[in-house]
């Protein structure tokens, strides 16, 4: 766990001044205790994806940060992820409030 946190913090420090979202692999060396599912992601309906086997963390850096940050996890688990309205759209709103 310490190694994972170090990895994430290292990348966040590198992108401190970046304004574009940066996508980082959640588990660069593969998911621990993987269930063995493989295959590509599928768009099952507009703005919903499924079959996520290589999850990522996307960092949205606020243009004028106020020192706060939030972690959002779009709902759906393995079946469907609502990436837009529970992910990208909310991240854009938080960035507008100065929250990374």
Can you describe what each PLM-predicted range is?
Residues 11, 64, 77:
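Short, glycine/serine-rich, charged loops/turns that create anion-binding
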Residues 54, 70, 87-91:
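Generic internal hydrophobic packing segments that stabilize the cores of diverse globular domains
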Residues 1-21:
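Bacterial Sec-dependent N-terminal signal peptides
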Residues 62, 75-76, 99:
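Beta-hairpin (beta-strand-turn-beta-strand) motif
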Residues 67-76:
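Short beta-strand element of the alpha/beta-hydrolase
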Residues 83-100:
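Short amphipathic alpha-helix adjacent to the substrate-entry channel of hydrolases
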Residues 19-68, 96:
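N-terminal cap/lid segment of alpha/beta-hydrolase-fold proteins
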């Amino acid at each position: 766990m310490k190694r994972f946190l170090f990895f994430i913090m290292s990348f966040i420090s590198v992108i401190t001044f970046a304004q574009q979202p940066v996508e980082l692999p959640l588990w660069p060396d593969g998911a621990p205790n993987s269930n063995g599912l493989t295959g590509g992601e599928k768009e099952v309906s507009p703005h919903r994806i499924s079959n996520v086997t290589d999850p990522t963390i996307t960092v949205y850096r606020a243009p004028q940060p106020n020192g706060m940050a939030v972690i959002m996890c779009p709902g759906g688990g393995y079946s469907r992820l609502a990436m837009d309205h529970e992910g990208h759209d909310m991240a854009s709103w938080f960035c507008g409030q100065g929250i990374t």
